[in-house]
Amino acid sequence: MRGLLASVALIFTATVAAAESPLFDAVATGNTAVVEQVLATGADVDSRARDQATPLINAALGAQLAIAELLIGKEADVMARNSGGFTPLHAAAFSGSVPISKLLLHHGATLDDAANKAGVTPLMVAGEENHVALATFLLAEGADVGHAEVHGYTPITRAIWKGNSDIVRLFKRHGAPCPPASRIGEKEYAKCMEIHD
């Protein structure tokens, strides 16, 4: 199961490597002017890579706020999903970008249906990557600290396994209990119980 924790990083690494169009290449430069030039040629703002990622997913993954704003201004789909079901909000969570997460939510992305095919939410990603500021923001926006993915693991479980004590503390403050030792292991349970405000 812990092998799945690395899956987010692998999926997003594949997304960046799977670029197949000039717009993906333009986003990869990080240069807004280059992205504008490519869009001016008629490039599809929601074009897809082999893994079904969109330019907006890649911009969010790279924490490229100006490019994300440009793509959204051209009506990029803020809830587009790659082949694993990851959205731009997942990508922003992976990069730890509070500004891009705010932008996405302001333009229609939702936390209610943001889970990917395995039930992984942006909050889980932020917790795994130890992005405390982003996890705090997502919780304030209504992210569910008790949401379980398909194997029954919650955000706190995944944060415990990653050793992210600040995230575990944050999740406990928001009502997440330590999972039972039978679920996460004696050592992990003891660590969780030791974490206090």
List each model region and its residues.
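N-terminal segments that cap or nucleate solenoid repeat domains
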Residues: 19-54, 58
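Ankyrin repeat structural motif
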Residues: 31-39, 64-72, 97-106, 131-139, ...
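Bacterial N-terminal signal peptides
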Residues: 6-14
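Ankyrin repeat boundary/linker residues
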Residues: 49, 82, 115-116, 149, ...
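Ankyrin repeat A-helix N-terminal signature
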Residues: 25-30, 58-64, 91-97, 125-131, ...
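Ankyrin-repeat inter-repeat connecting loop/turn
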Residues: 45, 78, 111-112, 145, ...
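Start-of-repeat signature of ankyrin repeats
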Residues: 52, 85, 118-119, 152
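Ankyrin-repeat-protein effector appendages
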Residues: 18-22, 141, 161, 165-197
